[in-house]
Regions:
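Conserved ATP-binding/catalytic segment of the ANL
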Residues: 4, 11-19, 23-77, 106, ...
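A sequence-level detector of short linear motifs
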Residues: 17, 67, 84, 194-195
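Solvent-exposed, non-membrane alpha-helical residues enriched in polar/charged side chains
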Residues: 33, 43, 47-48, 89, ...
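AMP-binding/adenylate-forming catalytic core of the ANL superfamily
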Residues: 28, 33-34, 56-168, 179, ...
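Conserved C-terminal "lid"/linker of ANL adenylate-forming enzymes
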Residues: 101-105, 110, 153-226
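Short loop/turn microsegments at loop-to-beta-strand junctions
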Residues: 3-5, 48, 53-54, 100, ...
């Protein structure tokens, strides 16, 4: 990693030894000096010449750096354990033609939830294949049950059981009414999901997912999203 300096810091700013995870901080001539006309962001990001990347990772040795996730996206269980959700999120999308986007959320909550954008055209085709009117309530129930099945393939008994730790799989699913695009600002210019905006916009959906009614994927909010 020469000529760049790298260190791994824990939440208290203590440098970590090889093999221990923490925030990746970098320093060197090729590291930015700060944000243009934004001293606050610069001060928050660069401390004593070290750029705090917001990435979680660890050094295997002096030459090998592993990046394992973003701190802002980390799932945090009620007991404080942390987990990077990107692998689950990517697989939910890649393994299903019915899911266009997915992010997971757990901020010391009772369980993890998923916020997904469905492929409505594929779901409507599925409903038509069952001989149902896609606009009917019966069809929408079938669509939601199908989305739940797409999540359940990673659970015990599913064909991809064991791919991810069971405790981090979503116990509830929020089906969102619109896709994520640059135009509605749910995607940034790099086509990455702006998690904060999604979570702020659909705060009511998320709160509902932590109720007995909302934990069942067949609920009023999800039906209204289809």
């Amino acid at each position: 990693v020469s000529p760049m300096e790298i260190k791994i810091l824990d939440a208290d700013g203590v440098e970590q030894p090889f093999g221990s995870k923490g925030e990746i901080c970098i320093k060197g001539e090729n590291v930015m000096a700060g944000y243009w006309k934004n001293p606050k962001s610069t001060a928050d990001t660069i401390v004593d010449g070290w750029l705090h990347t917001g990435d979680m990772g660890y050094m295997r040795d002096e030459e090998m750096l592993y990046v394992v996730g973003r701190f802002k996206s980390l799932l945090i269980a009620a007991d404080g354990e942390k987990y990077s959700p990107e692998g689950i999120e990517e697989n939910l999308v890649e393994s299903s033609k019915y899911i266009d986007g997915a992010i997971l959320h757990n901020s010391q909550d009772p369980y993890t939830i998923a916020l997904i954008t469905p492929n409505k055209d594929a779901l409507k085709a599925y409903a038509k294949g069952l001989g149902l009117d896609p606009a009917s309530n019966e069809a929408k129930v079938k669509m939601l049950e199908l989305l739940q099945d797409e999540v359940n393939i990673y659970r015990k008994g599913g064909r991809l059981e064991g791919a991810f730790p069971e405790r981090w799989l979503p116990a509830a699913v929020c089906v969102l009414p619109e896709p994520w695009t640059e135009q509605n600002h749910f995607l940034n210019s790099s086509m990455k999901v702006v998690r904060g905006r999604v979570e702020e916009t659909y705060k009511a959906h998320m709160e509902y997912a932590y109720t007995p009614e909302g934990k069942n994927i067949v609920n009023d909010m999800n039906l209204a999203s289809l």
